């Protein structure tokens, strides 16, 4: 293609003479029939007909009627007289077709003088191109909510998507024709629409003739040094909906800077390396509201004090899932690749598309939302943030920035919504990952200007679209999916979890939001009891899999100490046929265990003695299957006890899992004696649960505070945030080893960690202060201990007094380590969503099991029913009081987080995500605390 030079549409007129209305005032010509006007017949455009409206008419503007499409190749070489002649010939041509041009207005001279002043060349020999006036000055809706009042009267042309601009070989800084070779963009278009040129076959405006190319090409953007290469951009739209991220996704018209490329070329602005795509542009406050625009389009938001962070709890869920389910990722959680690949269409080209330039969830002109349903499982993955499992205090390798999506944000639902530029990030700690920002969807007129903003306002800002129900209609599909498609969360269900394939099939193409589960009286979800991931120590399965029968569904299971196990095999997860050899098993595992024990088989594992034993793979490795049978407590002597009543089954399984050190009734004592092994047998029972809790307790964590420097408010808060980040990672690792926790659904695991992390941290602070300094000081870490003097000098003295109450209660009650460990697990299970959890039944049974363990821990020191009951009341009352105490910490933490930039306080990344995603929910009362006693 020959190099084309961009030439301004206005030529200099004769000095002293009046400006030519034909050339000097393109704004005075009649706008051509747009996509919302009636159709007209033209000889030059025989393909135009009165057909139903399509997206082509919305995307590609019609040029002025005063321009001829036949003189494109010679426009840049014409003189002033040639242009005037072409204009008159075009008028004649249009006249023969039945169309007439609009005569100049009576105030054309005034407009000419204004245009001469505003559109004067910026320098000698340079001229700024002025686009035709027929270009629409308001932003267009790419998705369809801004349809005309009379759709049948709107013309449409079914064309192939016109070629997009491509960058020439030279650099942006060259002014000798290379930069001028760029296509001049119309000024009236919003930056996101400037990436599209008129369709092939349609007349172009005289600013820059364009030669169509046979294949659509991706728009390439001028980047800073070190950005992605040109070959990283592939086809933009090919069979799958995609949106143009470009310079602005907000729909506002961006002003052309004076320092633009030579010839007035205004391409997509350069991206700041600190922020991730999609790029956004400012919307001026005094810009008039365009017709068809909603009031949101001109609302200027104040995001100065709102940190730009990933505000989607689904993103945090993906991050935490990487820690909780790292074994199930087949090499997909590398240190350098911490993001899932951008979603791609199954029919799209394999050429990678620049992630920052082309966000997801846009529809091509020739497609309808309902025709592009995402498959349930495919090669696409929603943008998900993953965490690398790292040692505390280790440096995280820097990565290139990527974009976040706001929870529930749907471009179809908010077509005109202006997105302001990302404000500066709050100071980040050194180990946090740099260069990440989030696009925040805020309601009209909402702003956060001070720390005194109410929780409801913050909740509205952070969660405007998150909890909204899916909107019905052709242009408002549920977030990140088209109508008739499976939810975006369904691929997440493909990860190994405790849910059976039957429940996944029952969900089918369920909506993206999981159905709400009540606390009581609702159907139970499918459940694979014995499927544990690789690397998880398979211990204590009998206690973890107690399920309530349907007959007890109406009763409150919160403090039920006796419940009948559901008939699920504790070895392979199949339906159990009864209690065989002391354990609820299926017939297959019963026969296998009998033959293995009586036949004296010497099974050897071909792997690492950690094979998964479930209904499908139970026959793969007999060695691991037999080992699991022995760990569950199966013995040949137990076959005499098949018929148990409810109490006997419970006590028998308790005796198998945990031999009770205190006095027990004679009946269960006889049962426990029958479940013991002779010393000659080479079979080891699992240790008691309390001993296991002691073994998985995290090591000492340091804050990294420099005590040689004087304490300042910012330094103390930053050190506490660094300590909180490391403790949060430690909580995730600890919960992975917690017996029974991995049996819950993966989403329930993430939710419980998000809701209880603050309670666990302050509870651990109280225990360390009680054990190391007898409750006289706050023992945050070995290198960060605050005495009363340092508390008074800090800016959060009242908060320190609040936290100081916990170690003082420990001193008063003389809490033992066994009691503390059981109470710590109950704190993890103390707050749930209002609608319940996905694996609600398993959660209730796990919580009941640890309540029983707390009673056993109390029985180690307290003898007698009365003293044990009083002790249980005191400890559970302390757990209930922690809810109000932690709520004060949540409020202070969120206020500090909002003002972190003004206070110079650094918030690490993972902690920032939890704060931004969950604290507004908790403070707004959108969670349900589980209390032992009524207030």
Swiss-Prot record:
<dbReference type="GO" id="GO:0005737">
    <property type="term" value="C:cytoplasm"/>
</dbReference>
<keyword id="KW-0963">Cytoplasm</keyword>
<feature type="short sequence motif" description="LXXL motif 1">
    <location>
        <begin position="55"/>
        <end position="59"/>
    </location>
</feature>
<keyword id="KW-0862">Zinc</keyword>
<dbReference type="GO" id="GO:0003707">
    <property type="term" value="F:nuclear steroid receptor activity"/>
</dbReference>
<feature type="modified residue" description="Phosphoserine; by CDK2">
    <location>
        <position position="400"/>
    </location>
</feature>
<feature type="compositionally biased region" description="Low complexity">
    <location>
        <begin position="232"/>
        <end position="246"/>
    </location>
</feature>
<feature type="compositionally biased region" description="Pro residues">
    <location>
        <begin position="418"/>
        <end position="433"/>
    </location>
</feature>
<feature type="compositionally biased region" description="Low complexity">
    <location>
        <begin position="434"/>
        <end position="452"/>
    </location>
</feature>
<dbReference type="InterPro" id="IPR000536">
    <property type="entry name" value="Nucl_hrmn_rcpt_lig-bd"/>
</dbReference>
<feature type="DNA-binding region" description="Nuclear receptor">
    <location>
        <begin position="569"/>
        <end position="641"/>
    </location>
</feature>
<dbReference type="InterPro" id="IPR001628">
    <property type="entry name" value="Znf_hrmn_rcpt"/>
</dbReference>
<feature type="region of interest" description="Disordered">
    <location>
        <begin position="415"/>
        <end position="452"/>
    </location>
</feature>
<feature type="short sequence motif" description="Nuclear localization signal">
    <location>
        <begin position="183"/>
        <end position="187"/>
    </location>
</feature>
<keyword id="KW-0446">Lipid-binding</keyword>
<feature type="region of interest" description="AF2; mediates transcriptional activation">
    <location>
        <begin position="689"/>
        <end position="935"/>
    </location>
</feature>
<dbReference type="GO" id="GO:0043565">
    <property type="term" value="F:sequence-specific DNA binding"/>
</dbReference>
<keyword id="KW-0539">Nucleus</keyword>
<feature type="short sequence motif" description="LXXL motif 2">
    <location>
        <begin position="115"/>
        <end position="119"/>
    </location>
</feature>
<dbReference type="InterPro" id="IPR050200">
    <property type="entry name" value="Nuclear_hormone_rcpt_NR3"/>
</dbReference>
<feature type="binding site">
    <location>
        <position position="768"/>
    </location>
    <ligand>
        <name>progesterone</name>
    </ligand>
</feature>
<dbReference type="InterPro" id="IPR001723">
    <property type="entry name" value="Nuclear_hrmn_rcpt"/>
</dbReference>
<keyword id="KW-0597">Phosphoprotein</keyword>
<feature type="modified residue" description="Phosphoserine">
    <location>
        <position position="20"/>
    </location>
</feature>
<feature type="region of interest" description="Disordered">
    <location>
        <begin position="328"/>
        <end position="353"/>
    </location>
</feature>
<feature type="zinc finger region" description="NR C4-type">
    <location>
        <begin position="605"/>
        <end position="629"/>
    </location>
</feature>
<keyword id="KW-0564">Palmitate</keyword>
<feature type="modified residue" description="Phosphoserine">
    <location>
        <position position="81"/>
    </location>
</feature>
<feature type="zinc finger region" description="NR C4-type">
    <location>
        <begin position="569"/>
        <end position="589"/>
    </location>
</feature>
<feature type="region of interest" description="Disordered">
    <location>
        <begin position="1"/>
        <end position="256"/>
    </location>
</feature>
<feature type="modified residue" description="Phosphoserine">
    <location>
        <position position="162"/>
    </location>
</feature>
<comment type="function">
    <text>The steroid hormones and their receptors are involved in the regulation of eukaryotic gene expression and affect cellular proliferation and differentiation in target tissues. Transcriptional activator of several progesteron-dependent promoters in a variety of cell types. Involved in activation of SRC-dependent MAPK signaling on hormone stimulation.</text>
</comment>
<feature type="modified residue" description="Phosphoserine">
    <location>
        <position position="213"/>
    </location>
</feature>
<feature type="compositionally biased region" description="Low complexity">
    <location>
        <begin position="335"/>
        <end position="350"/>
    </location>
</feature>
<comment type="subunit">
    <text>Interacts with SMARD1 and UNC45A. Interacts with CUEDC2; the interaction promotes ubiquitination, decreases sumoylation, and represses transcriptional activity. Interacts with PIAS3; the interaction promotes sumoylation of PR in a hormone-dependent manner, inhibits DNA-binding, and alters nuclear export. Interacts with SP1; the interaction requires ligand-induced phosphorylation on Ser-345 by ERK1/2-MAPK. Interacts with PRMT2. Interacts with NCOA2 and NCOA1. Interacts with KLF9. Interacts with GTF2B.</text>
</comment>
<feature type="modified residue" description="Phosphoserine; by MAPK">
    <location>
        <position position="345"/>
    </location>
</feature>
<keyword id="KW-1017">Isopeptide bond</keyword>
<feature type="region of interest" description="AF1; mediates transcriptional activation">
    <location>
        <begin position="456"/>
        <end position="548"/>
    </location>
</feature>
<dbReference type="Pfam" id="PF00105">
    <property type="entry name" value="zf-C4"/>
</dbReference>
<dbReference type="GO" id="GO:0005496">
    <property type="term" value="F:steroid binding"/>
</dbReference>
<dbReference type="InterPro" id="IPR000128">
    <property type="entry name" value="Progest_rcpt"/>
</dbReference>
<keyword id="KW-0805">Transcription regulation</keyword>
């Amino acid at each position: 293609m020959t190099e084309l030079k961009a030439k301004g549409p206005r030529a200099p007129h004769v000095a002293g003479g009046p400006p030519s209305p034909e050339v000097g005032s393109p704004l005075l010509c009649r706008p051509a029939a747009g996509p919302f006007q009636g159709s007209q017949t033209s000889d030059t455009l025989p393909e135009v007909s009165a057909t139903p409206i399509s997206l082509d008419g919305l995307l590609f503007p019609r040029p002025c009627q005063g321009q001829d499409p036949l003189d494109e190749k010679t426009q840049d070489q014409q003189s002033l007289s040639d242009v005037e002649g072409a204009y008159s010939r075009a008028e004649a041509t249009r006249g023969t077709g039945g169309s007439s041009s609009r005569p100049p207005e009576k105030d054309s001279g005034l407009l000419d003088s204004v245009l001469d002043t505003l559109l004067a060349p910026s320098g000698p020999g340079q001229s700024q191109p002025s686009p035709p006036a027929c270009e629409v000055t308001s932003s267009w809706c790419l998705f369809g909510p801004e349809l005309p009042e009379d759709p049948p009267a709107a013309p449409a042309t079914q064309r192939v998507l016109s070629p997009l601009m491509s960058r020439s070989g030279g650099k942006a800084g060259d002014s000798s024709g290379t930069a001028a070779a760029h296509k001049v963009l119309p000024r009236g278009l919003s930056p996101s629409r400037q990436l599209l040129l008129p369709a092939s076959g349609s007349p172009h405006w005289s600013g820059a003739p364009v030669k169509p190319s046979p294949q659509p090409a991706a728009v390439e953007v001028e980047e800073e040094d070190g950005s992605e290469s040109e070959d990283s951009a592939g086809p933009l739209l090919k069979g799958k909906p995609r949106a143009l991220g470009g310079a602005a996704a907000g729909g506002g018209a961006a002003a052309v800077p004076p320092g633009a490329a030579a010839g007035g070329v205004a391409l997509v602005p350069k991206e700041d390396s600190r922020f991730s795509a999609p790029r956004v542009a400012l919307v001026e406050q005094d810009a008039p509201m365009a017709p068809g625009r909603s009031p949101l389009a001109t609302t200027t938001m104040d995001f100065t004090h709102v940190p730009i962070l990933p505000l989607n709890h689904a993103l945090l869920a993906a991050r935490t899932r990487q820690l909780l389910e790292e074994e199930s990722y087949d090499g997909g959680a590398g240190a350098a690749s911490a993001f899932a690949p951008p979603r791609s269409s199954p029919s799209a080209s394999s050429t990678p598309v620049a992630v920052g330039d082309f966000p997801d969830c846009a529809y091509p002109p020739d497609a309808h939302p309902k025709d592009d349903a995402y498959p349930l499982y495919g090669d696409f993955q929603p943008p998900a943030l993953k965490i690398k499992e790292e040692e505390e205090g280790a440096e995280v390798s820097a990565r290139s920035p990527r974009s976040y999506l706001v929870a529930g944000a749907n471009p179809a639902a908010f077509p005109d919504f202006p997105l302001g530029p990302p404000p500066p990030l709050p100071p980040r700690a050194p180990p946090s990952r740099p260069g990440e920002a989030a696009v925040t969807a805020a309601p009209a007129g909402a702003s956060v200007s001070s720390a005194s903003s109410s929780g409801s306002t913050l909740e509205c800002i952070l969660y405007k679209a998150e909890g909204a129900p899916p909107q019905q209609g052709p242009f408002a599909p549920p977030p990140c999916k088209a109508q008739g498609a499976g939810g975006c969360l369904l691929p997440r269900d493909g990860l190994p979890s405790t849910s059976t394939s039957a429940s996944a099939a029952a969900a089918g193409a369920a909506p993206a939001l999981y159905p709400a589960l009540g606390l009581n009286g609702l159907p139970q979800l499918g459940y694979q009891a014995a499927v544990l991931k690789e690397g998880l120590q398979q211990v204590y399965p009998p206690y973890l899999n107690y399920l309530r029968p349907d007959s007890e569904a109406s009763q409150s299971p919160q403090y039920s100490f006796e419940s009948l196990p559901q008939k699920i095999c504790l070895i392979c997860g199949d339906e159990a046929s009864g209690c065989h050899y002391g354990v609820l098993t299926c017939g297959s595992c019963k026969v296998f265990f009998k033959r293995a024990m009586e036949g004296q088989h010497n099974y050897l594992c071909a792997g690492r003695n950690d094979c998964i034993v479930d209904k499908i793979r139970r026959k793969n490795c007999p060695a691991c299957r037999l080992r699991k049978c022995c760990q569950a407590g199966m013995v040949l002597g137990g076959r005499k006890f098949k018929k148990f009543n409810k109490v006997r089954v419970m006590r028998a399984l308790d005796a198998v899992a945990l031999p009770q050190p205190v006095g027990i009734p004679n009946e269960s004592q006889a049962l426990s004696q029958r479940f013991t092994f002779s010393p000659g047998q080479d079979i080891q029972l699992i240790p008691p649960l309390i001993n296991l809790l002691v073994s998985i307790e995290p090591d000492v964590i340091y804050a990294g505070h420099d005590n040689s420097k004087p304490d300042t408010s910012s330094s103390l808060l930053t050190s506490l945030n660094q300590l909180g980040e490391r403790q949060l990672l430690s909580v995730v690792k600890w919960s992975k080893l917690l017996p029974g926790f991995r049996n819950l659904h993966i989403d329930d695991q993430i939710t419980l960690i998000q809701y209880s992390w603050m309670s666990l941290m302050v509870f651990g602070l109280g225990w360390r202060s009680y054990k190391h300094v007898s409750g006289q000081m706050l023992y945050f870490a070995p290198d960060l201990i605050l005495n009363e003097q340092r508390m008074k000098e800090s800016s959060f003295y009242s908060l320190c007094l609040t936290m100081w109450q916990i170690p003082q209660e420990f001193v008063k009650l003389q809490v033992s380590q066994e009691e503390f460990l059981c109470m710590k697990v109950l704190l993890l299970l103390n707050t749930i969503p209002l609608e319940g959890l996905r694996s609600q039944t398993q959660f209730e049974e796990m919580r009941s099991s640890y309540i029983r363990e707390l009673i056993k821990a109390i029985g180690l020191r307290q003898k007698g029913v009365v003293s044990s009951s009083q002790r249980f009341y005191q400890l559970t009352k302390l757990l209930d009081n922690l809810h109000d105490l932690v709520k004060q910490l949540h409020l202070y933490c969120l206020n500090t987080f909002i003002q972190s930039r003004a206070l110079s306080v650094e918030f690490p990344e993972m902690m920032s995500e939890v704060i931004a995603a969950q604290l507004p929910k908790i403070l707004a009362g959108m969670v349900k605390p589980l209390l032992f006693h009524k207030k």
